[in-house]
């Protein structure tokens, strides 16, 4: 989208922004509570309220008001008090789900851009869900030229703890950038592999994975 509008946007920008964006949300898979508790705690507006110093509050929205005006209206209308009433049923406080900006769960956001010989232009990792013991690891490279071959290797136990599954040619210039859900799910469902291997791909990862 940025390219179509002639806007220069590189991976390093996302790395820089995430290093300054505090990790505030205690929701699975990286946190403790199911996703519906994010709604109970106030959802996206609560996050916006915590990070509003980083936002352009003067932008116009579909309500006909600016973002800043929308956030003020929520406070005036008792939105956050209503959210706390949901959490009261579980004996929780909002801070159990969404931390204040100055008391975050972490200070490095949720993703990072990695660079190396396998991805010289950069690769994205959601580091908040990576086991700490895997931050530094030496793994065996197991390359596959399509997702189907990788799934078969996982399901037939060809992949062992200590392997790095590499799936190539699944990007936008390959097969159209399909979601790598099935391989991810096969790995996560295996008690031996879930926290002991890595998956690198030019394919797509979205909410499901």
Q: For each predicted feature, which ranges?
A:
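Catalytic or ion-coupling anion/metal-binding cores of large enzyme and transporter domains
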Residues: 1-209
């Amino acid at each position: 989208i940025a390219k179509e509008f002639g806007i220069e946007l590189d991976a390093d920008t996302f790395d820089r922004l995430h290093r300054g964006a505090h990790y505030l949300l205690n929701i699975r898979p990286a946190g403790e509570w199911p996703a519906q508790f994010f709604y109970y705690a106030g959802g996206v507006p609560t996050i916006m309220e915590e990070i509003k110093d980083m936002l352009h509050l003067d932008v116009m929205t579909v309500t006909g008001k600016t973002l800043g005006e929308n956030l003020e209206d929520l406070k005036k209308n008792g939105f956050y008090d209503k959210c706390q009433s949901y959490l009261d049923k579980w004996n929780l406080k909002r801070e159990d789900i969404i931390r204040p900006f100055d008391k975050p769960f972490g200070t490095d956001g949720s993703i990072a851009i990695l660079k190396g010989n396998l991805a010289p232009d950069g690769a994205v990792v959601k580091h908040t869900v990576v086991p700490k013991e895997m931050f530094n690891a030496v793994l065996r490279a197991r390359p596959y030229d399509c997702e189907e071959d990788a799934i078969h290797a996982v399901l037939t136990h060809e992949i062992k703890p200590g392997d790095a599954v590499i799936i190539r040619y699944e990007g936008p210039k390959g097969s159209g950038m399909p979601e790598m859900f099935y391989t991810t799910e096969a790995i996560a469902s295996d008690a031996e592999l879930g926290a002991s291997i890595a998956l690198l791909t030019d394919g797509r990862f979205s909410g499901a994975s």
